Each structure stands twice: as C-alpha cells, then as structure tokens.
C-alpha cells in the first residue's frame, strides 16, 4: 500500500444531512423524536421479554438481542447526527471517528447475522415443531448469538484498522453525517485498491451467506406451510414468520443498495438517504414490526399495563 508524505488529519468535519440552516431545527426535532421512540421501543421490548415468563422462549431470546443491537446501532450514529443540526461545524476527532466506524460496523454485521440466526430458529419451529425445544437448547441459542457478536467485532476491528492506517491529507471534510467507509475513502491520498477489494469481499461473503441462510430457511418453511392440511395452522405459521420476513427484506434490501454496487456508481447523497433509513428508521421500525404483528407480545404488554393499573389502584386505596 503506497503512502504519500503529507500532514495527517487529526480530526474530521462532518457535513451532515443538509447545509440549509432553515431545515436543521425541524430535522433535529424529527430525528430526536425518532431516536426517543427507538430507545423506548427497543429497551421496552427487552424489558417486556425479560419480565414475562411466557416470552422466555428461543424466539424471543433472539428478538431481545435484535432489539439490543438496534438500540446500540442507532445510539452510535444518531446523537452525533443530532449535534450536527445544532452546531455550525460538527468536528469529530480522528480517534472518535475510528471508534464510531468500528462500533457501527460491529452492530450492522451483528444485525445481519442475527437475522440469519432468527431465520434458522423459525425454520426449526415450523419444520420440526416436535423437536423444537430439543434442537434449540439454551446452549445452541447462546452460540447462535455469540458467534455473530464475535465475528462482527473481529471483522469490524480489522476493517477499522485498515481504514485508519490510510493517509488523509487531501481534505478533512467528510460528506456524510457519520464516519463511514465510502466518504472516508474519497479523502485519502493512499492506494485504496486493497481496501476496496476487502470491503467488497467482506460485504459480499457476510451478507450473501446471511441471505442464503435466510432464503434456504424460508424455502423449507414455505414448503412446510403448503403441506399443512389445516388453514388455521397455515395462518399461525405464516404469522410467526411474516414479521421476520418484513424486517429481513427492509434491512438486506437497503444494504444491497448501499454496499454491493460498483464504487463508480456511488452517489454520496443517495448513500446518505439510504444510511438514514438503515441507521435511524429501521431500528425504530423493528420494535413496531415485531410487536404490532405479534399476539404474544401484545398480550404480554396488556398484562403489564393491567398489573400496573391494579398496583396503582391498590396503593391509592391503602392511602
């Protein structure tokens, strides 16, 4: 990798979503509202799953981990983006930029692999219901979560080290609202061919493998549903999988648009809009997708609300 003698950047300036001052405050209010909804939705879902014993199953174990990743995923990006709306020049240090990129990649890859683990869980539940609790033991569930976290951390660490070993001397102005690969690579004066091949290989292998696991799992699930004689059984099986199918389609579709396209066709403005969708909107949507379309979660939420109301009435009567 060729290096050019130059003054290395010690900080970066994030351009943000817009240069129009009149849009910044409305966008700040909008994204702050979305972020608060994301935090409440995902943390609330985790607490609900932990509090209700009827939700202590492998399916909801994976869902609570997905909610945790969504919360972290959004929290890595959104607070800094909100600051960009309030300050004229949003400066981020070299080390903070590296940390943000590393954390972002860790949680993005974790989400992709967790969705694949959840697809396997759905496959076992629909295709082998009698063996479900035998196959999906606590040990297997922990492995299906630990492997994505471990792989994601190691891949993100290596990826971040490669990115920040490059020389940044052309400019320190990042045309994005967070530290991401494509905008950073446009600033470097180093040879980026190896880095771009690494991005393509990692994104391709990781996401294609994840998509294949999901695709194969759902092919077996669809065949199993079609073989069911009971219409009620087919409806229940489909309702079990529909939320996950929707979440998978939204997440992978956005990532394919972002990363699995030639670098020459990348438009940073289009990338910004796609990035908003999968770093801000998807973490907000997932709790809604999995809650509003899930009878067990809705019943557990009603139970919590009723119990709290009863406790409140009891305390009022004691007074």
Curated annotation (Swiss-Prot):
A Pfam family assignment: 7tm_4
Residue intervals annotated with topology Cytoplasmic: 50-56, 119-122, 226-239, 293-319
SS bonds (residue pairs): 97-179
Keyword Cytoplasm: no
Cell compartments where the protein resides: Cell membrane
Positions bearing carbohydrate: 5
UniProt keywords, alphabetically: Cell membrane, Disulfide bond, G-protein coupled receptor, Glycoprotein, Membrane, Olfaction, Receptor, Sensory transduction, Transducer, Transmembrane, Transmembrane helix
TM region positions: 29-49, 57-77, 98-118, 123-143, 205-225, 240-260, 272-292
An example Gene Ontology molecular-function term: olfactory receptor activity
Chain ranges on the Extracellular side, renumbered to this chain: 1-28, 78-97, 144-204, 261-271
Record bears the keyword Electron transport: no
Principal place of residence: membrane
UniProt membrane topology term: Multi-pass membrane protein
GO CC, alphabetical: plasma membrane
Function per UniProt: Odorant receptor.
PANTHER family (alphabetical): OLFACTORY RECEPTOR
Family listed: Belongs to the G-protein coupled receptor 1 family.
Name this protein carries in UniProt: Olfactory receptor 8U8
Species the sequence originates in: Homo sapiens (Human)
Gene: OR8U8
